[in-house]
């Protein structure tokens, strides 16, 4: 298998995984009361934003502590 096909296969697998997780989250949210939906959506948004922050900027806790306490 060529390197390009490996990249395409791994990208497809990763997208399939995210699609499965998104569908699971959506089905879970649709089956709970409205007050719980707000809490779940907030929690999922927080986890997702921390995940994205960690990918691009490193540790979110380090960023927050640097913002609060200044440089180490």
From Swiss-Prot:
Which parts pass through the membrane? 6-26, 38-58
Q: List the disulfide bonds.
A: none
Keyword list (alphabetical) reads: Membrane, Transmembrane, Transmembrane helix
Output the Gene Ontology cellular-component terms: membrane
Origin: domain of life: Eukaryota
Q: Spell out the protein name for this chain.
A: Putative transmembrane protein DDB_G0272126
Q: Which residues form the signal peptide?
A: none
**How does the record say this protein sits in the membrane?**
Multi-pass membrane protein
Q: What is its main location?
A: membrane
Location comes to: Membrane
């Amino acid at each position: 298998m060529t390197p390009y096909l490996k990249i395409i296969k791994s990208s497809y697998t990763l997208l399939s995984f995210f699609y499965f997780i998104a569908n699971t989250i959506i089905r879970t949210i649709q089956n709970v009361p409205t007050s719980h939906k707000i809490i779940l959506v907030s929690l999922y948004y927080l986890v997702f934003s921390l995940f994205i922050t960690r990918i691009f900027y490193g540790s979110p806790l380090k960023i927050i502590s640097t913002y609060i306490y200044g440089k180490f």
